[in-house]
């Protein structure tokens, strides 16, 4: 039995609140249960130096956790003067995932900067961030089209993400912190709205997992992401 009494395939309640802040071109508060992440998308003219003159755009991401997003206060990384390896890994994952969803030629020489700030953490912050950031990205692209900056929508498809893992010997979907911290296997899966895989991050924290267990976890992820994409679409309608 899971601590929350959810079934193995059951995700936490997912809520997406658009236009959560006033200034960003795209702004979303995404909630996976008690995990809450603020995702903003900023539309900026120009591209990084390595892309100048190539007629294509760029999507990049930054990620951070507020000091009291966790049970005990964390020192701000800005105060330490250095980003952790975890932070760098997660923001690269978010950026890679979102770039897969955008036609960079249609974006033109423009950049979209995604900022994901974890307000409250209870497991699955990176998957929540990707899910919310995708909706913020859609709003930023629509803003640019409304301003006449973009003639064609560069979005190829929606993307979403969910965590899966093996907890007490059983494959489960959307791990909360108490499950994540005790899981034998932990995996994050990013997929398109049609179920195609963008990225899989999977690690055996305890016992190695079998090929059959891997397929079972991917099936759980596909089912969970399908439900999350439906919530994304409802929020955008």
Curated annotation (Swiss-Prot):
<keyword id="KW-0819">tRNA processing</keyword>
<dbReference type="GO" id="GO:0006364">
    <property type="term" value="P:rRNA processing"/>
</dbReference>
<comment type="subunit">
    <text>Homohexameric ring arranged as a trimer of dimers.</text>
</comment>
<dbReference type="Pfam" id="PF03725">
    <property type="entry name" value="RNase_PH_C"/>
</dbReference>
<keyword id="KW-0694">RNA-binding</keyword>
<dbReference type="InterPro" id="IPR027408">
    <property type="entry name" value="PNPase/RNase_PH_dom_sf"/>
</dbReference>
<feature type="binding site">
    <location>
        <begin position="124"/>
        <end position="126"/>
    </location>
    <ligand>
        <name>phosphate</name>
    </ligand>
</feature>
<keyword id="KW-0808">Transferase</keyword>
<dbReference type="GO" id="GO:0016075">
    <property type="term" value="P:rRNA catabolic process"/>
</dbReference>
<comment type="function">
    <text>Phosphorolytic 3'-5' exoribonuclease that plays an important role in tRNA 3'-end maturation. Removes nucleotide residues following the 3'-CCA terminus of tRNAs; can also add nucleotides to the ends of RNA molecules by using nucleoside diphosphates as substrates, but this may not be physiologically important. Probably plays a role in initiation of 16S rRNA degradation (leading to ribosome degradation) during starvation.</text>
</comment>
<dbReference type="InterPro" id="IPR001247">
    <property type="entry name" value="ExoRNase_PH_dom1"/>
</dbReference>
<dbReference type="InterPro" id="IPR018336">
    <property type="entry name" value="RNase_PH_CS"/>
</dbReference>
<dbReference type="InterPro" id="IPR020568">
    <property type="entry name" value="Ribosomal_Su5_D2-typ_SF"/>
</dbReference>
<dbReference type="Pfam" id="PF01138">
    <property type="entry name" value="RNase_PH"/>
</dbReference>
<dbReference type="GO" id="GO:0000175">
    <property type="term" value="F:3'-5'-RNA exonuclease activity"/>
</dbReference>
<keyword id="KW-0548">Nucleotidyltransferase</keyword>
<dbReference type="InterPro" id="IPR050080">
    <property type="entry name" value="RNase_PH"/>
</dbReference>
<dbReference type="GO" id="GO:0000049">
    <property type="term" value="F:tRNA binding"/>
</dbReference>
<dbReference type="InterPro" id="IPR036345">
    <property type="entry name" value="ExoRNase_PH_dom2_sf"/>
</dbReference>
<dbReference type="InterPro" id="IPR015847">
    <property type="entry name" value="ExoRNase_PH_dom2"/>
</dbReference>
<dbReference type="InterPro" id="IPR002381">
    <property type="entry name" value="RNase_PH_bac-type"/>
</dbReference>
<feature type="binding site">
    <location>
        <position position="86"/>
    </location>
    <ligand>
        <name>phosphate</name>
    </ligand>
</feature>
<dbReference type="GO" id="GO:0009022">
    <property type="term" value="F:tRNA nucleotidyltransferase activity"/>
</dbReference>
<keyword id="KW-0698">rRNA processing</keyword>
<comment type="similarity">
    <text>Belongs to the RNase PH family.</text>
</comment>
<keyword id="KW-0820">tRNA-binding</keyword>
<protein>
    <recommendedName>
        <fullName>Ribonuclease PH</fullName>
        <ecNumber>2.7.7.56</ecNumber>
    </recommendedName>
</protein>
<dbReference type="GO" id="GO:0008033">
    <property type="term" value="P:tRNA processing"/>
</dbReference>
């Amino acid at each position: 039995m899971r601590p929350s009494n959810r079934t193995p395939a059951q995700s936490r309640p997912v809520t997406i609140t658009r236009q959560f802040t006033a200034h960003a071109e795209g702004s979303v508060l995404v909630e996976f249960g008690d995990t809450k992440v603020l995702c903003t998308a900023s539309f900026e003219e120009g591209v990084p130096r390595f892309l100048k003159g190539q007629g294509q755009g760029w999507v990049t991401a930054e990620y951070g956790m507020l000091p009291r997003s966790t049970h005990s206060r964390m020192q701000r990384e800005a105060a330490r003067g250095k980003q952790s390896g975890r932070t760098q890994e997660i923001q690269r994952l978010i950026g890679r995932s979102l770039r897969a969803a955008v036609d960079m030629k249609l974006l033109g020489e423009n950049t979209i900067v995604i900022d994901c700030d974890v307000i409250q953490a209870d497991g699955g912050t990176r998957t929540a961030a990707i899910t919310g950031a995708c909706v913020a990205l859609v709003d930023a692209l629509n803003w640019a089209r409304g301003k006449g900056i973009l003639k064609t929508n560069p979005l190829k498809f929606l993307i979403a993400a969910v965590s899966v893992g093996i907890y007490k010997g059983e494959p489960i979907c959307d791990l909360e912190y108490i499950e994540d911290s005790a899981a034998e296997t932990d995996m994050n899966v990013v997929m398109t709205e049609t179920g195609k895989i963008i990225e899989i991050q999977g690690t055996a924290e305890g016992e190695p997992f079998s090929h059959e267990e891997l397929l079972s976890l991917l099936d759980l992820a596909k089912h969970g992401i399908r439900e999350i994409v439906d919530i994304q679409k409802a929020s955008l309608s």
